[in-house]
């Protein structure tokens, strides 16, 4: 993959583990963004030692703004995200999960909001929940029904709070957001620009583990 030519404004973080089935859709949604040039954003994809055909899928992508890294061993999601953030160039950072995808104006509108609203240190967008076949299920308010992704942060503010906590194997995004909001403001874009895929292998369907980490989160 070629090196990016200019310093991008936005770094998109994708961490993937055995999501070869979904990763192409995710990347194509990000590589076909409107109203923003490719050199104005980068995509950092960290594969957490997948055992499926993820690497084979990625060989089809030669875009100048896509950087791919493979962990030598499985590090887990929080450590992989932190690794990507530390390698990022952009002043804004946003996480997109590898089984999800975004609207074509997602990056443009997120950047525009932060450029115009200096009092906010991040912006969250509403999301549409979709099924395996991308059939619409529901429109969700990201401030009331929070998910870990689709929030664009000013990067220095993420470093200010210490990035993701590796002890949270689930609900890591909610834990980060809780710490972030103690010091910083998150704005709200009432547009379903993020597409959250609800499928049979989705991590958030493991209710037993969710309850464990929710209890841990509530103690903080």
Go through each PLM region and give its residues.
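Short, acidic, metal-binding catalytic loop of nucleotide-sugar glycosyltransferases
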Residues: 28-40
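A conserved hydrophobic helix/loop-capping motif in glycosyltransferases and polysaccharide synthases
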Residues: 10-22, 26, 33, 46
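Glycine-rich, basic loop-to-helix element that forms the pyrophosphate-binding segment
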Residues: 71-88
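A conserved acidic beta->alpha catalytic loop
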Residues: 29, 47-56, 73, 97
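Short aromatic/hydrophobic "clamp" motif used to bind/position activated sugar donors
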Residues: 93
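Acidic donor-binding loop at a coil-to-helix junction in glycosyltransferase catalytic cores
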Residues: 170-176
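Conserved donor NDP-sugar-binding/catalytic core segment of glycosyltransferases
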Residues: 105-137
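Catalytic core of nucleotide-sugar-dependent glycosyltransferases
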Residues: 196-199, 205-220
């Amino acid at each position: 993959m070629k090196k990016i030519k200019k310093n991008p404004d936005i770094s998109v973080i994708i961490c993937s583990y055995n999501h070869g089935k979904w990763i192409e859709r995710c990347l194509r949604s990000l590589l076909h963004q409107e109203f923003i040039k490719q050199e104005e954003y980068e995509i950092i994809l960290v594969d957490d030692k997948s055992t499926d055909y993820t690497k084979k899928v990625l060989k089809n992508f030669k875009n100048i703004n896509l950087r791919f890294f493979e962990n030598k061993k499985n590090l887990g999601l929080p450590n992989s995200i932190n690794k990507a953030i530390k390698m990022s160039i952009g002043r804004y950072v946003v996480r997109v999960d590898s089984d999800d995808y975004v609207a074509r104006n997602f990056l443009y509108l997120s950047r525009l909001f932060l450029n115009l609203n200096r009092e906010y240190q991040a912006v969250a967008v509403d999301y549409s929940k979709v099924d395996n076949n991308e059939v619409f299920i529901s429109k969700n308010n990201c401030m009331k029904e929070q998910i870990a992704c689709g929030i664009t942060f000013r990067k220095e503010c993420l470093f200010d709070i210490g990035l993701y906590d590796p002890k949270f194997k689930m609900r890591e995004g909610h834990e980060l957001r809780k710490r972030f909001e103690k010091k910083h403001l998150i704005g709200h874009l009432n547009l379903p620009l993020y597409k959250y895929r609800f499928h049979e292998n989705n991590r958030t369907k493991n209710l037993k583990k969710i309850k464990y980490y929710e209890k841990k989160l509530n103690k903080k």
